[in-house]
Regions:
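Aromatic- and acidic-residue-enriched carbohydrate-binding clefts of CAZyme catalytic domains
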Residues: 5-11, 43-103, 116-134
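Hydrophobic faces of well-ordered beta-strands that scaffold small-molecule active sites
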Residues: 31-33, 108-110, 139, 161-163
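Active-site-proximal loop/turn and secondary-structure-junction residues that shape catalytic pockets
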Residues: 37-39, 112-116, 145, 167
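Glycine-rich adenosyl-nucleotide cofactor-binding module
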Residues: 1-20
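Surface-exposed amphipathic alpha-helices with a cationic face
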Residues: 21-24, 95-104, 150-155
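Short, solvent-exposed loop/turn and secondary-structure capping segments
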Residues: 35, 41-48, 173-174
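Conserved alpha/beta catalytic core and glycan-binding cleft of carbohydrate-active enzymes
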Residues: 147, 151-221
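Catalytic domains of carbohydrate-active enzymes, especially glycoside hydrolases
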Residues: 16-37, 133
Length: 221
């Protein structure tokens, strides 16, 4: 966070709370947090074994990378990330932030990344937990997940659920959905504007062609 932000607790839940007046000035109705649960920051790549026994001495040394984004299956999904807390109690600090957002008329949404190794029932359990424990208003769910499991869950009936691609036709057919809480998180406009601001070529179509039309083209409909 830039020093001009005026935030004392940069990179923390308290810091977000300090920016609430700014969010209100922007006129937004809520904020979407990237993964803010506890996840593994240290990513170690596997060592490459030599093709022949005598080449083992020459194998690459293990490289260590830092994961600052949180999009990994190596996570402890039930607790707020301690590294984003300005106090010794990240749970209390996160809850205080959510309450402050609600008092200001703002919603708090979160991104959750699930990899292919996780059981669908556990994914649902995690999202339910954050809804009940932390009063999160919505979730952007990333990964190969069973959308129907979330969209038809009564506990999440009034919870915003965002997916990269929402297959409403398959899930609902010609019927009216019981809970109108699902939406497609389409990043086309976001990336189009980013490319235009960078001065990239051929960005006009990327921005002005309706996103729905492009999505249907990608899906082959």
């Amino acid at each position: 966070m830039h020093r001009s932000s005026g935030v004392r607790k940069k990179g923390t839940f308290q810091g977000i709370e300090q920016k609430i007046p700014y969010f209100q000035e922007l006129g937004v109705t809520g904020i979407l947090l990237m993964p803010a649960y506890e996840y593994q920051e240290i990513v170690k790549s596997k060592t490459r074994q030599g093709k022949y026994p005598q080449a083992e001495e020459e194998r690459r040394e293990e490289k260590t990378k830092i994961n600052v984004w949180g999009y990994t299956g190596e996570a402890f999904y039930y607790v707020p990330k301690a590294g984003f807390s300005g106090t010794q109690n990240p749970v209390q600090e996160f809850c205080h932030m959510v309450n402050a957002l609600h008092e200001a008329g703002l919603e708090c949404l979160m991104e959750f990344y699930f990899d292919h190794t996780m059981e669908p029932a556990k994914m649902l359990d995690i999202v339910r937990y954050w809804k009940l424990k932390y009063h999160v208003d919505g979730f952007r769910i990333i990964g190969n997940v069973c959308q129907e499991l979330f969209l038809k869950d009564p506990l999440l009936a009034e919870t915003k659920l965002l997916f990269g691609f929402l297959d409403g036709e398959r899930i609902y057919g010609n019927k009216e959905p019981d809970y109108k809480n699902g939406a497609e998180y389409n990043e086309g406009f976001y990336y189009g504007m980013r490319h235009m601001l960078k001065g990239d070529e051929n960005t006009a179509e990327e921005i002005f062609v309706p996103q729905q039309e492009k999505s249907q083209t990608v899906r082959g409909h």
